[in-house]
């Protein structure tokens, strides 16, 4: 049992590796334990804490130390322990059969049995006498905490309770106490740590106090008393910041990162041997157990020494080495030679070599076991471990694997010999290193063959094969035997049962593969299906574009079989080929994988050259796999697609605007240089000598109007808009105005594409450092609504920006436009001044404004060819998921505006899911029927009928299908029309709400500006009047010598001067107020003008969408009305035509024509009089039905006779 002085748990979260007793001899990932940031161990139970404050426990529960309602002897898998609802756990401790947790509010809860034979606390119970608890530690039968003590000079003290047989409570006597008692230390307590039967504490100044059982001299090496009840200092001036206590010794860490151990333990330390141990690097954490110690350096190295009977040290040692004692410095420096593996005790530290290079977060030792919390790795670790990374949770494969896969999509999928030809070894090593370290970098500099090699290398170097060794041994031979049976059957061509045997074998192969996949661990299964789906993509692309040497399913199976099946085996590639072939069947069993794969494709492939590839892929797979067709229309899929389209569209627009701004800035700089050359004799250039077009953006901002008493000029408004607002305007933390961003898994897009865009952004940023580019954007406000777009970073968490523009490593866009302050603050001030108390109650009902100066529409110029091309591709993407009833162009146009208000994002997604792609009726059905009727009437001879029979049948079937669907379609669109109206009008209402709010704010601020200007003019007038009076008084010469008159004049002068000075101060204050109000007005005006086009576009969109749905319903009603009159005539002509020529066709023995007629008429009968009898009775009279049935009987008899 190990106890550590732990004040607050603020460690990063990772996976748990264990080694030693009951574990393997080397550090091994423990998949049963969730991601944790801290753990502690009692005698036979353990507690673990996550970074979100959730508590887990496992082990012995006979004393309810796991807080389980049932006294289960042992719990093997971690269970979640709820201390109190809606409260996070901040720190934990367990010892003996007792557990404790400090909550985030500083209260302490305990459960279990603290004192042997004492009362058992079955559920977490608050310790009432303690508040402000910061640290807790538990021994065998006693507990110690650091808590607030406001009535003492120290203000924070150590409190103990439990048994005191060995003096561990810090008071005289051996009584048992159940109530916390304060221990007198004389200084403010920082942390506390319990050994089995003693207690240690660190106080202010990093001094150590120890008390309790001293048999091993761990309390005081020069005191032979077995029990020391009064706290004593074992030494002075050691600067101790962390303690770890066990049964008979204490380990301590100093502030400079050295370790000191004292007490008596022949495997770790000896009495009197309390010198500091120096390590190659500074130590940041220690953990001591009964017989060994682990320490962690700042570089992530683990050093250990002590007993290694159960391989708990896990390192190699030279058994002949011994510590080197430096007598001059008083320190011990053990040697670090490693030659052989040993299980003997050693006082020499060495590193745990199996974890070299891993990012170790914390270490733990207990009993004869060791553990470490480690950041989940990528390469050469279990798949289950790598999927514990934050960026992999909820994904079908590790992030780096998905990046490689997406890089190989598109044009790279056509590379000849992909996965067969090798890449550069040096590039592959570099690529693996960068992926393993989670570096964000452009992958385009690597060849497709390099990425393909890394995929194979990753699968090959997994600790065990993807399909697991155990399952490979169980299924591989059986499946291969069935394949051999097929080969033997095919070689024996004389056997008439070959086909049946092969079918039986294939069924058995399919069943075995499905059973195999079902038994795989979840992470392995998801990665396998993701890989099979990708290999199927590569196979299709290779066969389509590589006529020779294409990497089809067979060739890919040959390459991948050694990497995912039994290693070293050959001839098992047929199994992988079968798995690729069975992908549609596999997807039916695991439809969620289809969702995850499409989401991944939508996030990564809807940009650049991969857009046509993914469109073609989605069209193909939706035809091949029903699961893909179903997934593509799910709300979360549509939401992901829309998010990706908006982000990429705004990204492209932003890059183009940046390029245009850069060119404009360069031209402006050239103009300024020319102007400077023309005015070399002038030391100062007045702003009035330069036109606004020749001023750089920075100069426009620095030049101020000579008088603020007048309204700002357009150029001044531009200088105050966009760019300045981006840094001065900030959305308040008030819920009414705080922006909430949509989440999407746009993880590190820099790694795979848009290299050129990123480089352009970087160049633009560098070029714009010397001059503010905001004026260029601002100038567009007065010219057109085509503004610089807001690039919204949508990461895994909601973001709220205030102040300066933040930087994000997850976004491929370097500049995030930030809205803030003036407009919104002004609005808030108005709400505050109005004394409204309902803001908090209504905050959730008010929309939040995301962007201020973003592009209200995608307007294209000759220079935006890339955007035009991309937009056309996006329209094709939307056409895959949205109904053609609504114009896709209108949707693309409104997208940037929709994402201006975060409240509308969800509404817009709901709207799109409502109008998702459903079957539509032919818009010119009545005209088509009329054309077919004319064609039937033109057929006079049997030869003509034979030539057109197939086309006639298909057209009749198509007309019947559309005709019967008209009623269903009308019903569907009338049902969804209110929802469409609700969502679209609600979107418009939010925009109108913001528009009205901004307009109102602008009006009120304009009134404030007028009043401020009026006040300023009034003060100026008053000052001028006083100055005139003073000048007049000064000009009057008094010829009298009367002292009283002279003194009165001086007094009048003094009064006027003071009044003028007072008035000047008021003018200065008024001028500042006028400047502020003027700036707010310009900001709100800019915001208003930027938002106005968005409202117009949204209003236009809502009008179009409502009108489109209404017109479509009207069109359906018209089609229904027209076809009710035309279809009977058309269908009767079709029947009469067949009656006219069927006898001649029979005589000519046109068996194919008779079969075609029989099949078509049977299908028509099924549609009209079986499946849709209720609808068809409105279109077909009883007489026509009788005639059709007669025709059916005749054609079927002809078919029977012909056979």
From Swiss-Prot:
GO terms for biological process: signal transduction. Its main location: cytoplasm. GO terms for cellular component: cytoplasm. One of its GO terms (molecular function) is GTPase activator activity. Residues 649-679, 995-1078 form a coiled coil. Keywords: Coiled coil, Cytoplasm, GTPase activation, Repeat. Residues 381-594 form the Rho-GAP domain. CDD domains: RhoGAP. SMART domains: RhoGAP. The record marks 420 as: Arginine finger. InterPro entries: RCC1/BLIP-II, Reg_chr_condens, Rho_GTPase_activation_prot, RhoGAP_dom, Ub_ligase/GEF_domain. RCC1 repeats lie at residues 52-104, 106-148, 155-204, 206-255, 257-298, 299-359, 361-410. Residues 320-343, 746-788, 833-852 have a biased composition (Low complexity). It is found in: Cytoplasm. Pfam families: RCC1, RCC1_2, RhoGAP. Residues 316-343, 657-725, 746-789, 831-852 are annotated as: Disordered. Rho GTPase-activating protein involved in the signal transduction pathway. This is Rho GTPase-activating protein gacGG. It comes from Dictyostelium discoideum (Social amoeba).
